[in-house]
């Protein structure tokens, strides 16, 4: 069995025993298998829309003799579960738009869901903002560097909190941790935004204003 990546190790660290989990987009099932081995009283539904990927997951689960802890299902998002089957959702490796689309399409399935753990590297402001709208707050966040890529992992819990634009953009918990990896991530974002602004064509006024706002936030927060 392949070793769990650093990225998925951080995702796994946010999961507790006695949880009823759906691992959406489980791919080869490595995260589900890791959790099933780690905890005694955990129930996992490993799902994927890709038949071949799920087939590999099924084989991996059988090799580890974990069929009693992990059930596999082929299908899209939350379509393949009932609300009483889950209290925790894990989604790792998808874009923010796709993730929010999955959750918004089946809001009735979230009634018993207390925890949602997400790893996404696209438009984290959009992700955080829409998770707040869905009735979840940011309980914890972590950064992890794996193969020279800095990944963001966020644990959302059911409840209400308000956040400023700055906190939704940078991440309120990441700001409070203020570690070297966060500064490195911000330095990279400053360089990326500066490059985009230098190359962007005339017009696109709203997009430019958004980029400039984000750049000001990054520069005012850190000396890079």
Predicted regions and their residues:
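Gly/Ala-rich phosphate-binding loop of Rossmann-like dinucleotide-binding domains
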Residues: 36-37
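Conserved SAM-binding motif I beta-strand of class I
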Residues: 43-48
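Short SAM/SAH-binding signature in class I
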Residues: 85-93
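S-adenosyl-L-methionine
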Residues: 55-84
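Glycine-rich SAM-binding Motif I of class I
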Residues: 29, 33
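Conserved class I S-adenosyl-L-methionine
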Residues: 18-27
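Conserved SAM/SAH-binding beta-strand->alpha-helix loop
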Residues: 50-52
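Class I S-adenosyl-L-methionine
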Residues: 2-10, 79, 85, 97-224
């Amino acid at each position: 069995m392949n070793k769990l990546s650093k990225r998925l190790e951080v995702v796994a660290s946010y999961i507790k025993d006695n949880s009823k989990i759906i691992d959406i987009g489980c791919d080869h099932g490595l995260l589900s298998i890791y959790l099933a081995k780690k905890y005694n009283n955990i129930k996992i539904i490993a799902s994927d829309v890709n038949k071949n990927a799920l087939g590999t997951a099924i084989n991996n689960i059988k090799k580890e003799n974990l069929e009693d802890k992990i059930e596999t299902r082929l299908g899209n998002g939350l379509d393949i579960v009932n609300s009483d089957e889950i209290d925790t959702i894990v989604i790792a490796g998808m874009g923010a738009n796709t993730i929010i689309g999955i959750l918004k399409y089946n809001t009735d399935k979230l009634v018993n869901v207390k925890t949602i753990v997400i790893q996404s590297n696209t438009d984290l402001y959009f992700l955080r903002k829409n998770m707040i709208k869905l009735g979840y707050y940011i309980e914890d966040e972590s950064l992890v560097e794996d193969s020279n890529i800095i990944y963001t992992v966020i644990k959302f819990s059911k409840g209400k909190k308000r956040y400023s634009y700055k906190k939704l953009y940078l991440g309120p918990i990441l700001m409070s941790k203020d570690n070297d990896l966060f500064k490195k991530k911000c330095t990279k974002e400053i360089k990326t935004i500066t490059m985009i602004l230098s190359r962007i064509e005339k017009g696109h006024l709203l997009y430019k204003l958004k980029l400039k706002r984000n750049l000001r936030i990054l520069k005012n927060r850190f000396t890079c």
